Each structure stands twice: as structure tokens, then as C-alpha cells.
Amino acid sequence: MTITPQHLIALLPLLIVGLTVVVVMLSIAWRRNHFLNATLSVIGLNAALVSLWFVGQAGAMDVTPLMRVDGFAMLYTGLVLLASLATCTFAYPWLEGYNDNQEEFYLLVLIASLGGILLTNANHLAALFLGIELISLPLFGLIGYAFRQKRSLEASIKYTILSAAASSFLLFGMALVYAQSGNLSFEALGKSLGDGMLHEPLLLAGFGLMIVGLGFKLSLVPFHLWTPDVYQGAPAPVSTFLATASKIAIFGVVMRLFLYAPVGDSEAVRVVLGIIAFASIIFGNLMALSQTNIKRLLGYSSISHLGYLLVALIALQSGEMSMEAVGVYLAGYLFSSLGAFGVVSLMSSPFRGPDADSLYSYRGLFWHRPVLAAVMTVMMLSLAGIPMTLGFIGKFYVLAVGVQASLWWLVAAVVVGSAIGLYYYLRVAVSLYLHAPQQPGRDAPTNWQYSAGGIVVLISALLVLVLGVWPQPLISLVQLAMPLM
């Protein structure tokens, strides 16, 4: 296949982030300067974000058999880049207090972003695997970045070993799918499944192993055991990336796979996915009830949020509304998570040992940082799915899709899970307004709202509220971002 200038325009975000990786690498080799390398990383990610406009003008197309650039890919690429940008912004003040090498952090985030962009454009199982590995490998280093902290090192080792096992399941599953169908392209797989091959035992075994591998990456029950420990052990900015960019990119490619290769047409696959979704929603919410560490709580809550999204994935063959539901839900989840983890990052900056992740650290926050407490309250309400926030719009969409597809038992799970979630999210929100302890622990800087991280947190809160009241611009954007069929 000949690469034309149009193809290069379609690949602009990938090329710009790749170029930024090289520039930052050379800059680190030339001179260690934290501010310079952080600025170069942020400029590169912003340029990649702006380039999406030019990609849109070029139109939808296939770039090599591995990648497809269309509205769907552009939307998810934009979300991944926003999450990466926020991660770099939150990391800067945290790294200011870090005595070891600071600059490599941005290099690892950029490489992981590259993997995320590759995943959102993937149209082939080979591209899917490459993207997942490219996003996972830098995370091994990022999670253990504060390696002098026992929890951070433990979390990194745990994630590395389990991630390697999950990747082997995924790869073996792909091998079985290829052995039965002779294809790795999503569309070619779809044609094979349309010819009645879906009920072949070897193919079902292959998809089953792929579900195990992808279930680990998305921290779905019962492949979730690493999640709370890794969220707690990783530095707060890394937990931000793990909860947002990583999940969005992987869920995006799974959506495309299920759309082109209708695996959900198999009753066995639908039942397995339904059980995983049900268990993730109920278990994730129940485990979050007893948490006193805010990062562990958000880790368990992310399990339930992926369970809600899985309901929309199961209903994918019922109509286009599922695509819309996932797009809106992921946008709401992104901004809510950026705000919540952003507050934790601000409270934990600069690096002085363990993060300010104990619920006790946030007790009475309103009385000395009222705006920060208000932002955290908005994020908790959005994650709980309270009306007038973007989280409510996403949850409403998921319920509507579940009802449309007659998935009544999963709709009941969403309702029960949301009711349980309301308790622990409100518990965090209420603690912000209690009497402050006599000896307060960690605290955000007095001028936090003037820092880049503070601005990102405030913009996230504003978007959650504005789009919660007037979601039409977001809905219109998601409706435009349909995949090329």
C-alpha cells in the first residue's frame, strides 16, 4: 500500500506524539531541565490535539490494513490526549519535590499516549496487541516511579507480572481465532462470523481467552485483583492516567472489534459478558463501601464504571444508541476522574513521601480550601450519577440502552450499583465539610488555582456542570464520531 500525503495527515496525532518522544529524549540527553522537558511534552500533546482538526478535514480512510482513521478514532484519540495532557500537568508540581530523575516521567507518558492513539485507530488484532503493549510497558515504570516508597514498588511488580500473564492469554486467544478463521482484520473476522463460524468451539475458546486478557486491562471482575493496590501504590498523577487514558483507549478498540466482528451475536459470549458486567457493578461498589483510602475507593469505583460500560457494549447490536451511550459516558467519566485525581495530586504536591490519599486528609477541607472542596464535591456527585452533572447523563444513557435491549437483570444491577455508590461518594463529599482536625496533614498550596494543575481541575469541574445541564454539544459531537463501516 502506498502512503500518500492524505494518509500522513490522517496520522498526524500519532506522528506528532512520536516526534515529541524523540525531541524530549534528545533534550534529556542534551540537558536535564525539568521545566523545559515538561513544556516540550505539553506543547507536543497540544499540537497533536489541534491536529485532529486537520485529520477531520482529510476525511475517514484506512491507513495500511492495521489502522482506520474515522470520526470514532478521532473522538477517542482526543479523549486519550486530554487525559495525557492532564497527567503531565498534575505531575509537574509533584515532581518538583522528587529528588531522582524527573524528566523520564514525561517520556513514559508520551510513549503510553502513543500506544493509546494506536489503539483508538486499530482495525486489526496485530495493531490491538501492539497498542496494548505500548500503553502497558511505560506504565510498569510509571507505577513504580516513586520506587523508594514500598507501596509504589510493590504495585509496579504486581502490575508487571499480572499484565504479562494477561498479555499471554490475549495473544494465545488471538492465535486460536486466527487458526480457526484465517483472519486478523476486524472486518474480515466479521465476514467469517457472518458465515456461521461463530459457534465453532476453537473460535469461542479464542474469544474467551481474549476476554480474559482484555478484562484484566479493563480491571473487570474477576480479573480486577490488581486494581486497588496499584491505584493506591502508584503516584497520584499516574493513577490519573491509569484510570482515564488507559481505560478509554482499550475500551474504544474493544467497541470497534465488537462492532465489526459481532461477537455479541453468540449467546454464550453475551451470557459471559453479562455475568462479568453484573459482578463488576455489584462487587466494585460493595468493596468501595469500606474504603478509607481515596485512591483505593476510586480504584474499586472504576471497576463498577467499566461494568456499566459493558452493559452498553452487550447491547451494541441493538442499535446506534449504544455507541452514543459509551461516548457520552466515557467523556463524563474522563472529566470526573480528572477532577477527583487532580484534587488528590494537588493535595500531594510537591512529592514528600506517600500521597495525601487517606480520607482523613480531606476532613474539613472546605474550611481552609473552599473552592477545592467544592470541586471535589462536584466530582463525587458526577461519579455517583446525580442529576445536573455529566455523570447523570452517561448513566441515564446506559439505562436507556439496557432497557432498549431488554437486558432487565443488568438494568437492575445498574440501579442497585448506583444506589450503593451514592453512599460512599457522599461519604467522601460530607467529610469535606466536617470540622477540620486539630493537626491537619497534607494540604494543597494556597495559590493552587493559579497553577496549571489547578486550572485543569477547575475546567473539568466546569465541564461536568455545564455539560450536565446542557449536554447537547457533547451528544452532537459523539453522534458525529461514528465509525466508518
Curated annotation (Swiss-Prot):
Signal peptide: none
GO BP, sorted A to Z: ATP synthesis coupled electron transport
GO terms for cellular component: plasma membrane
Enzyme Commission (EC) number: 7.1.1.-
Keyword Membrane (UniProt): yes
Top-level enzyme category: translocase
GO molecular function: NADH dehydrogenase (ubiquinone) activity; NADH:ubiquinone reductase (non-electrogenic) activity; quinone binding
Catalytic activity of the protein: a quinone + NADH + 5 H(+)(in) = a quinol + NAD(+) + 4 H(+)(out)
Residue spans crossing the bilayer: 8-28, 35-55, 71-91, 105-125, 127-147, 159-179, 203-223, 235-255, 271-291, 297-317, 326-346, 373-393, 408-430, 455-475
Membrane topology value: Multi-pass membrane protein
Function: NDH-1 shuttles electrons from NADH, via FMN and iron-sulfur (Fe-S) centers, to quinones in the respiratory chain. The immediate electron acceptor for the enzyme in this species is believed to be ubiquinone. Couples the redox reaction to proton translocation (for every two electrons transferred, four hydrogen ions are translocated across the cytoplasmic membrane), and thus conserves the redox energy in a proton gradient.
Oligomer and partners: NDH-1 is composed of 13 different subunits. Subunits NuoA, H, J, K, L, M, N constitute the membrane sector of the complex.
Name used for this protein in its record: NADH-quinone oxidoreductase subunit N
Lineage: Bacteria, Pseudomonadati, Pseudomonadota, Gammaproteobacteria, Enterobacterales
Underlying gene: nuoN
